[in-house]
């Protein structure tokens, strides 16, 4: 298409744009730039020729100094030219295929060019948002934001209005216009209840443009300074606060500032088309741009804050969905209650301990009996120390001494056992001297002797303190016979 139309730099405005964007220039030629704006506004083909020349200088140019000069010319023309040039620049095709493509990473643009393009797109999107035929740049701007592109912060002191809205002339003869003005007045009254009121200059009869008095101008500027102060405080808070670590009090103050500033912006937008003072209009437009910038920062801040909150809540929901591999508290309590319900009284515990001790004693007795059964009588007698009859009386006495030493029987019972042993030894000695044949008379005599021996037996319940009498020396044969009988008893 450009080939059919010829060289873009052949037209009068194209020639001037070529000179204004020459790479040999050290800085911008503002006189030439303003001359370009005049040609665009005064000629019929000026907007199209200028647009083609600027597009030619930017598109595919690797000399970023020339690109930077062309962007400056383009910005100057947008701010100083009318709607005809805005329609061409705000086209979505131009913004995407020329401006955005220039700052792609493959072209490796310098930071100054990158920030310049993004600043132009952002400022145009804010300025042309309310114009239906200039929303192409708005769509590109919103698309870039959705993709996560961070736009640089604009210098609030260097901002200037892109275009000044035309003065609105109201027709006093139209009733519908009068109704709309009255409705706007009521809306301003409602907003004044929620925000710091801006003074509304007196409306002249016939709803003509407002010409404020010097006193009203001074009051209006004092209110605008208050608005600028709120914007400055809000901007500083957005700079200092961290979205993920904001305190509730700071967040509440920030939200209150946001609501107040939005109400103030609404009042400013209502005053801009009605103020006839050009200087006041420029101040209102500049404050409006500052408000738009701080609102964008607040939206980005809220997006980060709400995003982190949603992430934390999703992690909490994920943690609740995980299977708990630890012990179930209900099962643990149930087990504890079951153990508490078991009969573990002192009686049952004592009975269990006694059964263990009894089984231990039985095992010891069985081991001793097995040892006795497994060894011969001669081996057993080797461990027995035979002393004088006065000390120990036979094997029974030795066993009694062992039991006394182990604490099996008391000392008094040992004395009783000695008396019984003496009685049995006497009977055994008398029966050993008798012949093997026994008649009835001898048996009767034996019974009488046993009866006499029973009379000589001491009282078991109250044994004498002196102890049993010492055996006479004549009892030695009887003791040997007793030992033989004991050997036979153990052999069985």
UniProtKB/Swiss-Prot annotation:
Pfam families: GAT, VHS
Chain positions found as Phosphothreonine: 164
Description of post-translational modifications: Monoubiquitinated.
UniProt keyword DNA-binding present: no
Quaternary data: Found in a complex with TOLLIP; interacts (via GAT domain) with TOLLIP (via N-terminus); the interactions leads to TOM1-recruitment to endosomes and inhibition of TOLLIP binding to PtdIns(3)P. Interacts (via GAT domain and the C-terminal part of the VHS domain) with UBC/ubiquitin. Interacts (via clathrin box and C-terminus) with clathrin heavy chain. Interacts with MYO6. Interacts with TAX1BP1; CALCOCO2/NDP52 and OPTN; the interaction is indirect and is mediated by MYO6, which acts as a bridge between TOM1 and the three autophagy receptors.
Chain positions covered by the region annotation Interaction with MYO6: 392-463
Protein name, entry field: Target of Myb1 membrane trafficking protein
Main location (coarse class): cytoplasm
GO cellular component: cytoplasm; cytosol; early endosome; early endosome membrane; endosome; endosome membrane; Golgi apparatus; membrane
One annotated GO biological process: substrate localization to autophagosome
Organism: Mus musculus
Subcellular location: Cytoplasm; Endosome membrane; Early endosome membrane
Domain GAT residue range list: 215-303
Lineage: Eukaryota, Metazoa, Chordata, Craniata, Vertebrata
SS bonds (residue pairs): none
Known function: Adapter protein that plays a role in the intracellular membrane trafficking of ubiquitinated proteins, thereby participating in autophagy, ubiquitination-dependent signaling and receptor recycling pathways. Acts as a MYO6/Myosin VI adapter protein that targets MYO6 to endocytic structures. Together with MYO6, required for autophagosomal delivery of endocytic cargo, the maturation of autophagosomes and their fusion with lysosomes. MYO6 links TOM1 with autophagy receptors, such as TAX1BP1; CALCOCO2/NDP52 and OPTN. Binds to polyubiquitinated proteins via its GAT domain.
Region feature (Disordered): 167-215, 450-492
Glycyl lysine isopeptide (Lys-Gly) (interchain with G-Cter in SUMO2) crosslink site(s): 385
SMART domains found in the cross-reference section: VHS
Leader peptide range in chain numbering: none
Residues with PTM N-acetylmethionine: 1
UniProt note on tissues of expression: Ubiquitous. In adult brain, it is highly expressed at the mesencephalic level, in the hippocampal formation and medial lemniscus. In cerebellum, it is highly expressed in Purkinje cells and granular layers.
Positions of modified residues (Phosphoserine): 11, 160, 176, 180, 208, 355, 376, 462
SUPFAM superfamilies: ENTH/VHS domain, GAT-like domain
Family, as annotated: Belongs to the TOM1 family.
